[in-house]
Regions:
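Active-site neighborhood of phospho(di)ester-bond hydrolases with catalytic His/Asp-centered motifs
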Residues: 1-4, 27-34, 53-55, 116-118, ...
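Conserved beta-strand hairpin/beta-sheet module of binuclear metal-dependent hydrolase folds
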Residues: 1-25, 126-134
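Metallo-beta-lactamase
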Residues: 5-6, 110-112, 121-171
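Active-site HxH/HxHxD metal-binding segment of metal-dependent hydrolases
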Residues: 9, 18-99, 103
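A structural alpha-helix within SAM-dependent methyltransferase catalytic domains
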Residues: 13, 17, 43-46, 162, ...
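Long, contiguous hydrophobic alpha-helical segments, chiefly transmembrane helices and signal peptides
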Residues: 39, 62, 76, 116, ...
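Short, flexible active-site-adjacent loop segments at beta-strand->alpha-helix junctions, enriched
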Residues: 56-58, 101, 117, 130, ...
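Charge-patterned, long linear interaction tracts outside catalytic cores
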Residues: 98, 104-121
Length: 171
C-alpha cells in the first residue's frame, strides 16, 4: 500500500533486498490517492510490471500526470525534484480503477476499497482484515506527537472528510 515519492524507490528496494525480496516481484500496488507523497513513485513499480489500483477519479492523473505535476509545481516550485523526484506517466493497462467496497484479491489476501473523500475527491482507504490503511483521511502522526489533520489541499471538502472519518470508525 502506497509507494511514496519516486525518491523513496531506491530505499524501498534496499529494504526489500535486506529481507531477500526482489522489488521486481511486486505485482500489485494499492494507492490511497494520487498526491505525490503517496503515489509519486507508482510509475517505477508499474515499469517493473506492477498493476496500480486507484480510485477512478485518480486514474487519469497517473496515466497522464501533466496536470498533477503542474499543480504540484505551483505549490513547490523549484523544490519539486528535491521533495518528490521524477514523475512519469503509467501505461493505462497498468492502472486499475476500483469502486467503493470492491474487494481486490492478491494471492490469499483480500483488500477492500473504502471511498473516503474529503482530503481528496479520489481518496480510498484500504481495509485488510481489521486493519485500515487510511492514507491522509485519518490524519498524520509524526514521531511521538499527536495525530494531526494532514496538510489540506486546495480542494478539501470538510463535510465529506467528516463523513469519511465516521465511515472508518464504523468499520
Amino acid at each position: 500500500v502506497e509507494t511514496g515519492p519516486s525518491l523513496y524507490y531506491e530505499e524501498i528496494k534496499k529494504s526489500l533486498n535486506d529481507i531477500n525480496v526482489d522489488i521486481k516481484k511486486i505485482k500489485n500496488v494499492l494507492v490511497t490517492h494520487i498526491h505525490l507523497d503517496h503515489s509519486g513513485g507508482a510509475w517505477k513499480f508499474a515499469k517493473n510490471g506492477a498493476s496500480i489500483y486507484v480510485h477512478p477519479k485518480g486514474a487519469p492523473h497517473l496515466i497522464s500526470p501533466e496536470k498533477l505535476i503542474s499543480s504540484a509545481s505551483m505549490i513547490y516550485g523549484n523544490d519539486m525534484d528535491r521533495l518528490w523526484g521524477k514523475v512519469e506517466k503509467i501505461n493505462s493497462e497498468k492502472v486499475i480503477s476500483v469502486s467503493n467496497n470492491e474487494i481486490i484479491k492478491i494471492g490469499n489476501f483480500e483488500f477492500k476499497a473504502l471511498y473516503t473523500p474529503g482530503h481528496a475527491n479520489h481518496h480510498i482507504a484500504w481495509q485488510f482484515e481489521k486493519n485500515i490503511f487510511t492514507g491522509d483521511v485519518a490524519g498524520a502522526k509524526i514521531g511521538n506527537g499527536p495525530v494531526m489533520p494532514a496538510c489540506p489541499p486546495p480542494d478539501i471538502d470538510l463535510k465529506k472528510w467528516e463523513e469519511s472519518l465516521i465511515l472508518l470508525e464504523k468499520q
